[in-house]
From Swiss-Prot:
Keyword Cell cycle: yes
Organism: Staphylococcus haemolyticus (strain JCSC1435)
Gene Ontology biological-process entries: cell division; cell wall organization; peptidoglycan biosynthetic process; regulation of cell shape
Catalytic activity as recorded in UniProt: UDP-N-acetyl-alpha-D-muramate + NADP(+) = UDP-N-acetyl-3-O-(1-carboxyvinyl)-alpha-D-glucosamine + NADPH + H(+)
UniProt record similarity statement: Belongs to the MurB family.
Annotated PANTHER family: UDP-N-ACETYLENOLPYRUVOYLGLUCOSAMINE REDUCTASE
Pathway: Cell wall biogenesis; peptidoglycan biosynthesis
Family matches, as PROSITE patterns: FAD_PCMH
Entry EC number(s): 1.3.1.98
HAMAP family: MurB (MF_00037)
Name used for this protein in its record: UDP-N-acetylenolpyruvoylglucosamine reductase
Length: 307
């Protein structure tokens, strides 16, 4: 890879200098409050800048990592080499008739609220999902009986060559916590949702109910990575973990939540290594006790810390 100072000069010639940060600590951008530094942390505000960065990185063989709002991800303390592209500044939300077009970095909660404000129904389920639009499409996020595939019209993505590709709902191949975005290593830049006219009092009542249920059941008072495991067929991950007597089990500063066994919370300056070790322990115990494999929903990226 090129020297850091050479990459910096190249980037300054490609994109606005004020969106470039060098050796940027990533823990401030994740819900777990863990993670080392990024060699380069870039915050583009336009799709064209994303394309320019991706094409440059491809040409120079520099690895690229994308970050949304860091709600369902663990970044290791060794940090991330190459370029990290933050999508948070791609945060426009435009409403027209029964459609909403939102940038990848928009919070899906804010899109849900925009739908409510325009008396549109269909996104109430997302009122408590902490992720970004890009992350929500990436994993077909869902909650309380609704999921992204129920309401998305299309997504505009960028591929590893820096080309823009638009995918319809069907072409996105949205499945349980999966999509073509994952399979083809794409990144969502924008998504459009088609909703239905509703009644404001009914929309608000549903959102209030879902918010209350979320706040009463989830450990929102601590840093966490959200739901750690996918739902195994025929089971609930949280119930299996609870029945394995693992609630409150701690590795370092991270423990299985006493409030909801499907969550792991950072209660005392925990590290990404603590999270990983705890995840492996829980997987091992549940496998031994119930012969059920727990697969991670949370993404783990970055390098392990040097010894």
């Amino acid at each position: 890879m090129l020297k850091q100072e050479d990459i910096l000069q190249d980037l300054k010639s490609l994109i606005p200098e004020d969106i470039i940060k060098v050796n940027e600590p990533l823990k401030r951008y994740t819900y777990t409050e863990t993670g080392g530094n990024a060699d380069f942390y870039l915050s583009p505000t336009k799709n064209e800048d994303v394309q320019a960065i991706v094409r440059y990185a491809k040409e120079k063989d520099i690895p690229v990592t994308y970050l949304g709002n860091g709600s369902n991800i663990i970044i290791r303390e060794g940090g991330i080499r190459g370029i990290v592209i933050s999508l948070l500044s791609l945060n426009h939300i435009n409403v027209s008739d029964d459609a909403i077009i939102a940038g990848s970095g928009s919070a899906i909660i804010d899109v849900s609220r925009a739908a409510r404000d325009h008396v549109l129904t269909g996104l109430e389920f997302a009122c408590g999902i902490p992720g970004s639009v890009g992350g929500a499409v990436y994993m077909n996020a869902g909650a309380y009986g609704g999921e992204i595939k129920d309401c998305i019209d299309y997504a505009l993505c960028v591929n590893e060559e820096g080309d823009l590709i638009q995918f319809t709902n069907k072409e996105l191949e949205l499945d349980y916590r999966n999509s073509i975005v994952q399979k083809q290593h794409l990144v969502v830049l924008e998504a459009a949702f088609t909703l239905e006219p509703g009644k404001l009092d009914e929309i608000q009542a549903k959102m209030d109910d879902l918010t209350e249920r979320r706040e009463s059941k989830q450990p929102l008072e601590y840093p966490s990575c959200g739901s750690v495991f996918q739902r195994p067929p025929g089971h609930f991950a949280g119930k299996l973990i609870q029945d394995s007597d693992l609630q409150g089990y701690r590795v370092g500063g991270v423990e299985v939540s006493k409030k909801h066994a499907g969550f792991m919370v950072n209660v005392d300056n925990g590290t990404a290594t603590d999270y990983e070790d705890l995840i492996h322990h829980v997987q091992k115990v549940v496998k031994e006790k119930f012969d059920v494999e727990l697969h991670r929903e949370v993404r783990i990226i970055g390098e392990h810390p040097k010894e």
